[in-house]
Each structure stands twice: as structure tokens, then as C-alpha cells.
């Protein structure tokens, strides 16, 4: 199946049903009082994470989704039926962005997680709600509100512990083939990897972690060059980044400049991603003598002023790969779990429409008054009638 990690959809929550103006009619009870019922709420739109899905391809073909409208109220204090909700299944790791506002509406991280993305309209109030000691025959009602309409960009972010980045042909796919059962395509031309791939790595002590291989970056990727930043988003949930550097590029380019290009693109994309723990992997060390490889690596480290961890590997022969994986597994055990701060929770809170609608309605705002009533004498008044046998 084709891998699709981004799709645009339009969701339309159901409108609320209208309240009704009605009066009780019964033999020998000339003035039975108001009995208009409320309308029903409109249906909501939800997203639900499903571990059995791994692509958003279904939403490329069907982009429009509508929840059901609430039914209108009726006489006899009968409330209208609530509109049916609609639930859209998406892969685990999907987030929804409101295209118009840029607001993150939902982020689904675990199987079965369910979040609302569009709220149905509130029900209108019947005239019974407006009855009081000074208003015995209210002719006021409120209309149901419109359901929310949102245009959403669905983004599937891979859930991986370790993310790999580097220029095309740096050896990222070869590395993931060496340390896991994943078999991404490997060839001697740029952009062999066109879609992300995941591999499960087994380390010592029965430890394991997931590594993600994304397509290579080039200069200007943050501005859309090459495959752009479309796949950089998959690094946002990684705990550690592996920056793969080819110490002997086939095109004769400078490894230092290549490394600086990746660092610059990462910082332009996101300060948060750029601030994640990042290790350097010097690949293809088997193409040089050990002394020559060490000399070139030291030159790169000095030029980058690098003081963090680095490893020398040869992915094609698996030299140094197992030691690296063991170190990664131990290092991730020391990392604290990401805890969302109160500020981040407040920033991620989604405000839906109509939260204060009924409070405003009862205060007189948005009230509709039916002025064509003839008090109690109109035989066509939509009143509720009960026939009683003499």
C-alpha cells in the first residue's frame, strides 16, 4: 500500500435543532401554558487512533465528512433527537491542524485514543424555558446554532525512539538494514529513500528501540528544496537523533560543509528538534586506512567544535553498529519521559464554538420572538391538543 503521511479533509459538525413555541391544549383547559420543547444538539466529529492503520491514504479519496443535524423540538415538552456523531479512524501518531488558524486540534498517541475536532451546534430552547411568574405565555425561543466547520490537515508522525538524518547517500538506509530487519532500498544515486521506514533494533539485555530512516536533506530543505521539510516532522517525537556523516563523499564534497548544512536546516525547521540529543555517526570508515579515517574525523570534529558523543562505523560491513546500538539503548534508559508543562497544556487547549451559548440565550441574546400569535384564540397555533371522551 502506498505510504501517505499527509492529507487534507473538511469536517462539518451537525447543526443544533431549533426550539419550538407551543402551548398546551386540552378540553376544559383553555390556557394550558407553554409546552415547547428544546431542539437536539448537533452531532460532533471525532478522530480515533487505530493501531491497524498505517497510512492516511483513505483520506486522499474522500475529503468531506458531515455529522448529523439535531432534530427540532416539538410540543408536549418533547426534546428533539440529538444528531449522530461521526468518528474517523486514523493511524496512531496522527495529529490534526486547523488550516485556517494553525491550531493543533488533536494529537493521537495511543491506540483507542479519541479526540473531538469539530463540535456540533447547541440545541435551541423551546418557549417553556422562558416561562416565569411575569411571563405566563412566553413566545420566545432560540434557534439551534451552526455546527463547527473545519478544514484540517492530518499529519502522520512516525513514533520512533531514534531518528536518522543526513545528506542523500550518507548511508542511513544501509545502517538501518544492518541493525534491524527493515529492508529500505539502497542504491548509488541521491534520494533512493523516498518515504520514511522504521526498524526495530535489538540491543543487549533484551532491550529494543525503534529507529526511523527519513529521506536525505539538502541545502534549502527548510524552504522546500528537495523533498523539503515534509519528512522532518517525523523527527519531532524521536528521543535521540543520529546525524550520519559520509567521511568520503562520492561527489568529492566537503564533509564539514555537509554536516553544517544539516545542522543549519535542522535549526531553521525547529529549535525544539535541533535541541534534542544528537550523536554523530562517521560512516564508511572502511574506505580509508584507520589512521587516515581518524585524521579526517578529528578534522571534522574540530571544525564543528563538537564535544558530544560520536561513533565510527561502517554500515555496509556492520563494523561498530552493535556497540552503537547498545550505547543507544543504555542512553535512552537515562532520559526522562517528556512531561507536558501547564503552559503547553494551556497552549494546546482547543476552544470550541458555542460554549457560552445557552447562558447568552437565557439573558435575552439570540432570542427569537414569534409575534404572530393571537394570544389564546388562534386555532392554527401549533398547540398540543388532547381529545378526551365525554
UniProtKB/Swiss-Prot annotation:
Domain Obg: 1-159
Keyword entries, A-Z: Cytoplasm, GTP-binding, Hydrolase, Magnesium, Metal-binding, Nucleotide-binding
Origin: domain of life: Bacteria
Pfam families linked: GTP1_OBG, MMR_HSR1
Subcellular location: Cytoplasm
Binding residue positions for Mg(2+): 173, 193
Top class in the EC scheme: hydrolase
GO BP terms in the entry: ribosome biogenesis
GO annotations of cellular component type: cytoplasm
Requisite cofactors: Mg(2+)
GO molecular function, a single term: magnesium ion binding
Residue span, OBG-type G domain: 160-333
InterPro entries xrefs: G_OBG, GTP-bd, GTP-bd_Obg/CgtA, GTP1-OBG_CS, GTP1_OBG_dom, GTP1_OBG_dom_sf, OBG_GTPase, P-loop_NTPase
Enzyme Commission number(s) of this protein: 3.6.5.-
UniProt-recorded name of the protein: GTPase Obg
Biological function: An essential GTPase which binds GTP, GDP and possibly (p)ppGpp with moderate affinity, with high nucleotide exchange rates and a fairly low GTP hydrolysis rate. Plays a role in control of the cell cycle, stress response, ribosome biogenesis and in those bacteria that undergo differentiation, in morphogenesis control.
Subunit annotation: Monomer.
UniProt family annotation: Belongs to the TRAFAC class OBG-HflX-like GTPase superfamily. OBG GTPase family.
Species this chain originates from: Aliivibrio fischeri (strain MJ11)
Binding site for GTP: 166-173, 191-195, 213-216, 283-286, 314-316
Xref: CDD domains: Obg
